[in-house]
Every structure is written in structure tokens, then in C-alpha cells.
A protein has these predicted regions:
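Ribokinase/PfkB-type carbohydrate-kinase core domain
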Residues: 1-152, 157, 208-223, 227-236
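Conserved post-catalytic alpha-helical subdomain immediately downstream of the catalytic base
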Residues: 158-235
């Protein structure tokens, strides 16, 4: 479990009006976190929310868009997150956020992952408007579903308990690894592998960034520790 003490400060006021997408050479615009950006979480008559309008502007300028969500236990997901999905190319969230947005319980009563509900939630996020790819990550690994209906699974790196110093930032590290792969045009399985290795690297330090290392060093963690058991029999 993690406890966050957060002061929104300037994030509560930022509207994105200072961004000029026509001048950037970037390929991907990543926006995070929905539910923590007060100004962008406000309603917008045309797009649903101001965050959705900002993502739409990025898409109109030719950028691929990605959005992340904070794990907030509230009923705001329908009002704030869903409108943005229509303007998101890559939706990368954890199982709690996917479940809250799509309306599924992805954990069974005993805490195990419900892979059927997970598939349904990913499909629902695509139906809600995500353009290309949904990635759902969790301590056991990650799952991806494409707009074409292709499914991909990647178990987590099997780090020994003594090597885990903290879990803060692991989801963001996975997201960064996946986005790196998408930016470079890698296949989805390689993107998930890279994301999981980045998450494993993050786990080795109690801070959000102290465990990060070179791509090769992160990938070497998988070679050293191998992977957790397959999430579904078909992976074996």
C-alpha cells in the first residue's frame, strides 16, 4: 500500500493554453493525471471536458495522444475520464482505474486477477472511444488490446522480495516504457516487455525515479530474474 500527500498547486490552475502543438516536433502528447488537474477536469460544452478539448487539439495537429488517470476511489471517472477517451490513441492505466472507468471489478474477492473481466474492461474502453490501444497494468504484469481486437499478455519480472524497495512510480515507469516502444514503432509485445522491465527497475528504489537506469540495464533484469507465472494458460 502507498500513501500520497499531494498539493495540487499550479496543477490546479494549468489549462494547457500555453501549448502550441503546431510548433512541436514531438510524436506523442501524454497528459496526466486526469482527476488531478482541476482546470482541465472542468466541463467543456463541445468536447465534454477541457482535458478532452486539449487532447483533441493535439490530435488535430497530428500527434498521437496518451492519457493517464490517478487511482482515485470516487465516482468522478464517468464525468471526467470517459469524455477524454474519444481523443486518446493510447490508454495506459492500472486495473483499478480501468475497472472504475469501464464499470468492471477486475479483482476477485480473494484478490486474484479476473482475466475475463480484464478483457471486458479493455474492450469497453475501446468502445468508449480509445482509438488504437488499451494497456492495463497490474503487479502481476500487463495486458494490451488493440482496436483490431488483438490481445497481448506480459507477466511481470519476477523480482525477489528483498530487491523491492518501494512501489511508487512503477506504473508510470511501465507507461513510459510502453510509450517509448510505441514512439519507436516496436511491436506490442516488445512494448509490454519494455514497460514491465522499466517497472521492475523502478521497484528497486523507494523513490519514483531513483531506480531508473538505461534500457539495456532494465531489460537485463528480465534475463536475470525471469518472469512471474503466465497470467493465462495460453501464454505458456
Amino acid at each position: 500500500r502507498r500513501t500520497f500527500f499531494h498539493l495540487r498547486a499550479a496543477n490546479a490552475l494549468w489549462s494547457g493554453n500555453d501549448l502550441d502543438f503546431a510548433r512541436t516536433r514531438a510524436r506523442i502528447f501524454h497528459l496526466g493525471y486526469l482527476l488531478l488537474l482541476d482546470e482541465l477536469d472542468k466541463p467543456d460544452k463541445t468536447h465534454g471536458t477541457r482535458a478532452a478539448a486539449l487532447l483533441a487539439a493535439a490530435q488535430a495537429a497530428g500527434l498521437k495522444t496518451s492519457a493517464d488517470v490517478v487511482s482515485e476511489d470516487s465516482e468522478r471517472f464517468t464525468r471526467v475520464v470517459i469524455p477524454a477517451l474519444k481523443f486518446v490513441d493510447y490508454c495506459i492505466v492500472n486495473e483499478f482505474e480501468a475497472g472504475k472507468t469501464a464499470g468492471f471489478k477486475i479483482r476477485q474477492p480473494d484478490g486474484t486477477l479476473d482475466t475475463v473481466a480484464l478483457r471486458h474492461a479493455a474492450g469497453a474502453l475501446l468502445q468508449l472511444g480509445v482509438k488504437e490501444l488499451v494497456v492495463v497494468h497490474f503487479p502481476e504484469g500487463a495486458f494490451a488490446r488493440t482496436r483490431k481486437g488483438e490481445d497481448f499478455w506480459q507477466p511481470a519480472v519476477n523480482l525477489p522480495t528483498k530487491a523491492i524497495a518501494g512501489t511508487a512510480g512503477a506504473g508510470d515507469a511501465l507507461c513510459a516504457g510502453v510509450l517509448l516502444g510505441l514512439h519507436e514503432g516496436w511491436d506490442i509485445q516488445r512494448c509490454l516487455l519494455t514497460g514491465n522491465c522499466a517497472a521492475a527497475a523502478c521497484l528497486t528504489d523507494p523513490t519514483c525515479t531513483g531506480g531508473m537506469r538505461s534500457l539495456k540495464a532494465a531489460l537485463d533484469l528480465a534475463k536475470k530474474h525471469r518472469f512471474c507465472p503466465p497470467l493465462e494458460p495460453a501464454e505458456a
